[in-house]
Amino acid sequence: MSHRPRSDRHSFSSPSRFWHRLGMGLLVAGTLALPVSTLAQEGGEGAQPKASPSPIQSPNSSNGEATPRSFFNSGSPRSAEPKMNYGQLIDAIKANQVAKVEVDTNRRQAIVTLKDAPPGSKPQTVQLLDNNPELLNLLRSRSETIDLDINRTPDNSALYGLLTNLLVVAILIGLVVMVVRRSANASGQAMSFGKSKARFQMEAKTGVGFDDVAGIDEAKEELQEVVTFLKQPEKFTAIGAKIPRGVLLIGPPGTGKTLLAKAIAGEAGVPFFSISGSEFVEMFVGVGASRVRDLFKKAKENAPCLVFIDEIDAVGRQRGVGYGGGNDEREQTLNQLLTEMDGFEGNSGIIVIAATNRPDVLDLALLRPGRFDRQVTVDYPDVQGRELILAIHAQNKKLHEEVQLAAIARRTPGFTGADLANVLNEAAIFTARRRKEAITMAEVNDAIDRVVAGMEGTPLVDSKSKRLIAYHEVGHALIGTLCPGHDPVEKVTLIPRGQAQGLTWFTPDEDQSLMTRNQMIARIAGLLGGRVAEEVIFGDDEVTTGAGNDIEKITYLARQMVTKLGMSSLGLVALEEEGDRNFSGGDWGKRSEYSEDIAARIDREIQAIVTAAHQRATRIIEENRNLMDLLVDALIDQETIEGEHFRQLVESYQQSQKQPALAGK
């Protein structure tokens, strides 16, 4: 039988050394498992105990019952499954049935190999006792017949204890290091509050150039000149021209101010810094001014360069005023910005570009030449500009051949570039939802309605309410068609959108920046058309709340005519001075400098204008009562009537009556 390597080997040829080690090293251990056959069977009277197995019988073979295994066998000199108790070992030695004993002095175990063990059987495991006088005597007497092998497995308890202590120390050190690093980061963050948060690009790759900007040619030309200043400064300095210090982009939201800044960054080829005005000010005092200094310090190191400040009104608001009291931190930030842009040291080579839609709240010192030398207005695009913008946004979209960008541009007056991009995107979404291969005019029209009026609702069923809404909307459309000076009808629909149960669109033939008095009176009459139709058809007691928004617009237009535009008997005087509008859209800054008598006259003038328009609308509705019933029936049947079809219905009815229906001449 082969054996694994041993640390030392002993035989009974050296008995003195063996007895010493065995007597000093054995430890008390109880029997781990006892064979069932060795236990006296309990029973009633007359029960007989079972015979004990022979010393060489395997305990787990008794009556076919298995003996529980020991969990202490791993790491023993030899793997052994069967168990033998101490008494069975003594009996086996006395019977001269033991061939070999392997002793593990650390584990206090003995692996016993029997002489007559069946082939393939495993050695027996025996737990040794603390005092073994009987075993010592037996081994002395049979030292020549029993092969003894003593092994000492390594005692790793000290090593494990050392490793455990080292692990605890390592964990403590790690915790200390983590706490120190966190505190260092916290202090570093506190110190970095004063650093600028501007995004820096050595060569800005915005993906936008001047070719991607359309509809605002005047503003684009101004900024292209700034790029030329940066690329070819000698062209201007040769004749004594100076590079402008700053360019302020002014315009309504969505008109392309930020897009222009991206185009400048993409075309200039110089270092580009971009930051929002709200990123300067923090909760700590002095942080805003420190960030301004840090921003311009970096800009001077990379001059010539561009610095873009978006929404500059967040930090450049006029000092010393405000509805909520002063803000010293914001004013300190503004003072530092003024100094950096045009102070004692100057900032040669740095061009500051800023954007805002609130130029009325900016500090006057910020707007003076030397800081923002140029103020570029980015206004709503005209019809040609809208067509060019649509062409840019339609490049990556699949349009049906029936789609005409010029027609879309004519139908979208007052739309910004962002609105037009949203219209085409909504049209593409409608096309995908309807599983069409290309965008048609139906999707474009639905997209315009979606952007202007909101999401489409569920159409009303035929009822009294639907007929009443139809008369209301036809009243608007009929007044707009028959009243000279009014914008033409674009569409009349009973399909709800947003909060409106029905809608009537009017689209001017051309972009209008000026309006005549006749046009304003016609617009007031058109707004009254819905209420007048309810009064004529259903009576004064059946009018609804549907005209609430119309009446608000009527009152605003009439008041503007009286107090601001000089279109009343009060003469050419401005009775109300517009103040700065706040962010919530209110008119807290409006001042009214007139007496109570003038206020009463203003109210009478407003009432006179509205009354005249109401009488005009009533006359048109009453003179075309049958035409109105015809149009209402058509609208209920079709739910939507386009403007051209509506005008054809009116013209065909007029021809059938052989008399003109025009009024107000």
Swiss-Prot record:
Annotated localization: Cellular thylakoid membrane
TM ranges: 22-42, 160-180
Membrane-topology descriptor: Multi-pass membrane protein
Binding annotation for ATP: 251-258
Location (main, coarse): membrane
Annotated GO biological process: protein catabolic process; proteolysis
Disruption phenotype: A homozygous disruption strain was not identified, suggesting this gene may be essential.
UniProt cross-references to InterPro entries, sorted A to Z: AAA+_ATPase, AAA_lid_3, ATPase_AAA_core, ATPase_AAA_CS, FtsH, P-loop_NTPase, Peptidase_M41, Peptidase_M41-like
Biased composition (Low complexity): 53-63
Cofactor remark from the record: Binds 1 zinc ion per subunit.
Cofactor(s) the protein needs: Zn(2+)
Top EC group: hydrolase
Induction: Slight induction by UV-B light.
Pfam families assigned: AAA (PF00004), AAA_lid_3 (PF17862), Peptidase_M41 (PF01434)
GO molecular function, one term: zinc ion binding
UniProt entry keywords in alphabetical sequence: ATP-binding, Hydrolase, Membrane, Metal-binding, Metalloprotease, Nucleotide-binding, Protease, Thylakoid, Transmembrane, Transmembrane helix, Zinc
Annotated Zn(2+) binding sites: 472, 476, 550
Segments of this protein annotated with the region Disordered: 41-79
Enzyme active site: 473
Cytoplasmic side: 1-21, 181-665
Lumenal compartment segments: 43-159
EC number(s) from the headed UniProt entry: 3.4.24.-
Function, in words: Acts as a processive, ATP-dependent zinc metallopeptidase for both cytoplasmic and membrane proteins. Plays a role in the quality control of integral membrane proteins.
Family: In the central section; belongs to the AAA ATPase family. In the C-terminal section; belongs to the peptidase M41 family.
Subunit details: Homohexamer.
Protein name as it appears in the record: ATP-dependent zinc metalloprotease FtsH 1
